[in-house]
A protein has these predicted regions:
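A short glycine-rich, Lys/Arg-flanked "PGG" loop and its adjoining helix->strand segment in the class I
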Residues: 106-118
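Class I SAM-dependent methyltransferase Rossmann-like catalytic core
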Residues: 1-7
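A short SAM/SAH-binding and catalytic strip from SAM-dependent methyltransferases
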Residues: 91-103
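Core SAM-dependent methyltransferase catalytic element
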Residues: 149-162
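Conserved class I S-adenosyl-L-methionine
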Residues: 127-142
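Short beta->alpha hinge that forms the Motif I/post-I loop of the SAM-binding pocket
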Residues: 53-57, 104, 129
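Conserved SAM/SAH cofactor-binding pocket of Class I
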Residues: 10-94
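Conserved beta-strand signature within the Rossmann-like core of class I S-adenosyl-L-methionine
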Residues: 119-126
Length: 162
């Protein structure tokens, strides 16, 4: 697993720019790494943020970064949705871990439906050339929109029906 120790990677930066949340939303930063997406959501829209991370070192960094940035949030260690039981969210944000393989990425997409509220959205960033990811999001949700493209990355959004 790789982290960007000195700067936010380009994909995460693009998702930060495009992320849509409302005041008071409950947001899940799935596979949060050191917490950039969740921290931005908490600061921008005063969201209730839950972050999950399987890597103990990254989870510890996310907790520390929440503290350093003076924002509320909860970091739970575990794989993907496992630490969440039956919780639901208004928004799930994720920098899809393409290096983990499509099977893992598809688990993220398919699992999102069980953790999104009515009208909730899955907002992800992925490397360009990810037609199979876009197709899977459409199959899972019946919709997918490319909201941004830059530097080899795309931000894709699918929404739950209401």
């Amino acid at each position: 697993m790789r982290f960007s120790p000195k700067r936010v990677d380009r994909g995460t930066a693009l998702l930060v720019e495009c992320m849509k949340t409302e005041d008071g939303d409950k947001v899940l930063d799935l596979g949060c790494g050191y917490g950039v997406l969740g921290i931005v959501a908490a600061r921008r829209a005063r969201c209730k943020v839950v972050m999950t991370e399987i890597n103990a070192r990254a989870a510890a960094l996310a907790r520390r970064n929440l503290e350093l940035n003076g924002v509320e949030g909860e970091v739970r260690e575990g794989n993907l949705y496992e630490p969440l039981t039956h919780e639901t969210f208004d928004t799930i944000i994720c920098n899809l871990p393409m290096s983990a393989g499509l099977r893992h990425v598809f688990e993220i997409i398919d699992g999102a439906k069980g953790h999104l509220r009515e009208h909730g959205s899955l907002q992800v960033v992925v490397r360009k050339g990810s037609g199979r990811v876009e197709k899977r999001m459409f199959e899972a949700f019946g919709n997918v929109e490319t909201v941004a493209k830059r530097g080899g990355y795309r931000v894709l959004v699918s929404k739950m029906p209401g």
